[in-house]
């Protein structure tokens, strides 16, 4: 064995890493990166006649088609005017159509096909002339062409290119030969391209081969060139060390071998002798038997008895299957005979050895030799290699970076990092140093040899390191049809290859199939177990040994070794001949050995600074630098950009090289090197010169490394800001990071408290009922009270004028009321006494009528930021005008019922006297209960037919009088008085949106009208009071109803003024709009755009809906929305089951009502009935939740049987037994958006379906274009969807987002004409990043102006004149015991819990304030983790979360942490950062039934701890006050900036939007002159949340972008080259219906980076960068303006369905873009080919997916067809080209593109596609899990998705994304199929 000296990696001098197999793509240092051989062959073919010797058919097509395309400028003209034609010749008729389709697919040339000799022979000359006239490429069989030439119908001088397929035929006597003879006599012979794959068939003699090639070259007058796939793969790779080992003969000591051999021989002879007459139809009965026995015989021969035994056992099992299925008697007999033989063999073996252990006596010498070789590869122990040096030596050309990033620049600690990474990246680089393949001939040999090696590994520790597997190419060929059986096999094989590729196995035993086409890593050991029998087999197995140090070992038996040595000589000779034929042949066997000594002297290095350690490029390292630079240029997966070097010998001897860089490098001119005395030096010298030039133009940095996209030269662009120092955790700009901001107070309301004797302004709050509540929504058949019917109303008294703002709606019980704020009088003053009176009344309204005062708030109008007064107005002194109603104010001051219950005594002597008029417009207070906080009721009706003696509705009491006597011990003095039907005064103070509509303006489901009617007419469901027992409140009901609207009115006023202020501010900063509006101008009303969505269809009841349809005259006609648009379901559940509702919007502490939510009942002790509990303080809304936690938005149907006999509630003590309780509570997904996780579906986040079309009614010739956007629209842009308002910023944000991208893209494109796309897109992504937008938004002060959370007056609204009192914040209401009865949610004692009017039917699901993060998946995980932690008690909430049952009304409302958190409560963790603390989703998991008083939750202050947790309590944690501050995620601020941009864009146009961006600090326009003073210091917040130093842009003027000057390079022959290159493009221009003025744009749009023949323009990448943004904007804008008014969710889906590569690529193919595409990339060529074929079959577009599906039936192998990105790219780049060519006109681009896109836009708008991955995650949010990617045998990616409990689904594709969507699609198909089968279960 000593003779075997292997160069194993472990023994190699450079340390084992050198031989590591996974150094896949090394960057060469001494030669230019080799280009693909097809590319080189094409280059040769353009230069001279060649014969291409290629192995694969596809490569030949590529060269032939591209060559004809490159020469096509010669054939496009008119045949009669000397244009030429191209002819493809094939040998047989079958091949004609193949060639035709290839040419048609890839070019726009007209192709004629001729295959029928008989038919064409009789054609006359005219007929042929006509054919040549109409076609440019003619494909025909050689016989036809010969005939045409002979008859003189066409002469060869009219042909520019002759392609001979299978040109080797010309050696024999063949038409090809005759055609070439005719060529000889022709003066202008066409260019000739010969294609052959069969120059090497079977064995051939090198001498013959050489002769054959020379012969062929002479006949075809061409040079034969072969591609590298016939020579060892890459001629630049180091050659493996080849070793032939003689293994010696097998000594059969036991005689077993001989016996087995005899048995098998006999059996085989017997089978051969069986002469069964077989008809040709029948199967030969002995075939299977022969096959099996001969396999067994071969194994015995090659591997020995031990293996023969193993294989016999395997075959017996196989035979059993055959025997079982065999029908025919004779066949069975033979099979049974075989079976017997095999069993006999097994028996014989058993006598000699136990089957378990491996005995070396019974294996052949070959096997023993093999095991010896493998022992050599045993790795060393790890410790030896702990030193870092040989880990990575950057100067070696096979330096491998272990980090993922390709962009690593040298830094000191890199090496150490690398070292750590290796530990994790691979199982362990050391144990797997071997990466080997053993080639065997037969399938069974592979299987058994694998078992043998495994067995040997068990017994021999030296071999234990081997982890082997076998692969037998069984059906692995790419294109055979595969059945199920083979499919399984195929999967197994793929798995084997995956493991080998991942180095989980280090040895592969393979049959020859793996020689070809399978993607396998570079091996360092290849063993031919059976000798290669022909050259091809030799070269391909050898070609697998591609690691830098590798061995190619051939094992030979002694008897064969002589013969093989001859063969090997032959192979070597053939290889040498082919090598010389190798295109651009360059034999580098000797290059390595040349001494590289004093090259530096020959040519000095390029050094940056003259010191020793300075970066330098020497003549020896220059080439590596150039290769590295090219590799870093942007390119697609198919193109590996490489430099091109041409070296010529100069006449006087020296060599000179010219270097061409790829066309997307800014250095475009060819670099000519100095003359050098050898070719290699010439190449190195030119590289050195090139490095110098690249450094000078800034493409190499000062370390002489390629400049990454990050180290951009355009620092000013990125405005690299010092990131604010902040202790806030989370990545800036993300949703995870939230910060607090003061809520803005409009300047005009700030410090506006009137002072005595100073001029004041009095505004009247006008209220008009514009849309009365329709009957079907008026459940109680209440009378409607239009506010305009009574003259007394409210006004605002302020010291400052209030700007004009649009009218806006509020929604009261009577319907939609339009509010206007009109100036009544100004310039008057009041004295101190009057002011004090007014102030007291103002306070009275908020503290008593609205009950908004609470300990945390203090009334201090003189100190408060915002302190105007609200006061009653009335028509006074018969003047008919409104004025302050001092008399009324004074009356109230005097009234006894003003605050408490008046103490009136009636007696028999002075009985109660009923006066009807006192009760007509009254609010009454029951005097006998709830003394601390009496209830107030509106009188709805006076029942004159009832008296206290009337029958009581429930059986316990006879009469009303008896009830009061029994229950309250009250005697009535007047038994004839009528009774009063009353309604609760409103507790719902948020009237911004209507109750019966959800946020999108969709009506909620109602129960049937009949049920409701019956219910409301029964006395049991009414509150009936006795007038004598009630006091009358001094404030009349009509005014009270108006007072209830005040919080909503003032809040909306406040917001609109903030928006107006922003509009004025922008007018100053950006010069868009006017600072102050004209006097006579008012913007149109604020409207949700819902007008017509409220129609009969939306209600379940069928009554006509006339009331809503009548538009009142003061309404504008506003763009409206058909139902379909609003169909995405609510994200707020609003239940309208009248009596049993949860009145949701109440705030815990003072809700006035607590009723049922469809079957959620409260029994006395508030325990859960049947698992349904009402739990959770979420954002101050009571949320009802069924016992199931609603996770995400799964469809939940929780059918709960609720016991009929739940405890009744007393309604005025009327027992109420048959309270209607619904029997099921089915919360469908439509109405329930669970509380966990962000809504992902489009059903949720969207609110406003329309953006208000404010243009429609602008009065008096002004327009928002000149004045600036409507404050209503600005407010929309400031409102997050979390605020649950009638509108939000989402639609505007999407529009702004796409315009922002467009504006920045155009700016960068025009400003940096020399930057390549990688840099431009890096700059763009930095500028449009959320982080940057957040910074700009913050600088502008947007966060303070934003509307972030739901308006909930008792919790987060600060009434005017109040301040938050910091000291009292912790006051706490301790005891929960009130007279021993449980306190109900509304603070009443439960025994007189009244079934109140359900004020708010909305079940608001307080939602995270951001809806979509970059990766919505992460969210749910976060939320779930959060909830788990909560439930585990790791948060600040402890295991038993305590919640006071319900806090009583006058408790303070601040969040505080629990009073005494037990020790085990861990601090809050940072993963909670993404919570909106004001809307506490998680709390809904807490169970109130466990509540205890002491750990009371209070709702107004919230202290989330910092990142590192509250453990170190010394740190200040952010706590914020809900009244004056808001907590906003950074990303929401970025969204708001985009929405504001959208708002300016829609209102004022594109130029205004660009100016707006400039004023923000995002440069999208060039500056005309520098500002005089630029005060853009970073804004500091003053208290009011505005920046102190507003960015003053007044000094800067912005100009217009200029089109970059040149699109064509200076070039002597530029025009001529251009005409050549775009010949034929006029047809394309016709097709798209646009003529280019500058054709260079057209050429650039179609030039791929690999197309180096275009020397006059850039490649399409820059235009694609531009076009991408333009199309995105145009399509988004089109969708936004769609009259269907899509909701934000639909808009997002449509946008991603239409703006994606698949759609663009499909359209590009549909409109023939691919035929004009200029690229030289073999892989890309094939992908496009596949895709085009696929599109033809499919002939229709598919949405969303980058993968269009191939046929669906083949479930197992669903491989998606790949969409060539380049096709989508040129679709975009053409848009960019048109934009530039048309002088930057978006209209022109849309004119060309809309007709192409329209059918799809229509199709998708009608039926919105969703990406399969998203759809699956929405369908199965909890259970769908995607696996990491695995590689398949041909290098694709496979992904598996498991839907827990429903199965696993695989998808395959070229990238993870593609495979993932394929897997998701299959999962969906399966899930949907299952759903449809079990609808009823």
Swiss-Prot record:
A Pfam family hit: Ribonuclease_3
Dicer dsRNA-binding fold domain segment(s): 622-714
Cysteine-cysteine disulfides: none
A GO term, aspect molecular function: ribonuclease III activity
Keyword match Ligase: no
Binding site for ATP: 54-61
GO annotation, cellular component aspect: cytoplasm; nucleus; RISC-loading complex
InterPro entries: DEAD/DEAH_box_helicase_dom, Dicer_dimer_sf, Dicer_dimerisation_dom, DICER_DSRM, Dicer_PBD, Dicer_platform, dsRBD_dom, Helicase_ATP-bd
Reaction(s) this enzyme catalyzes, per UniProt: Endonucleolytic cleavage to 5'-phosphomonoester
Cofactor: Mg(2+); Mn(2+)
Domain Helicase C-terminal: 425-594
All copies of domain Helicase ATP-binding, residue ranges: 41-217
Domain PAZ: 887-1034
Note describing how the cofactor binds: Binds 2 magnesium or manganese ions per subunit.
Oligomeric form and interacting partners: Component of the RISC loading complex (RLC), or micro-RNA (miRNA) loading complex (miRLC), which is composed of dicer1, ago2 and tarbp2; dicer1 and tarbp2 are required to process precursor miRNAs (pre-miRNAs) to mature miRNAs and then load them onto ago2. Note that the trimeric RLC/miRLC is also referred to as RISC.
Protein name: Endoribonuclease Dicer-S
Organism: Xenopus laevis (African clawed frog)
Lineage: Eukaryota, Metazoa, Chordata, Craniata, Vertebrata
Gene encoding the protein: dicer1.S
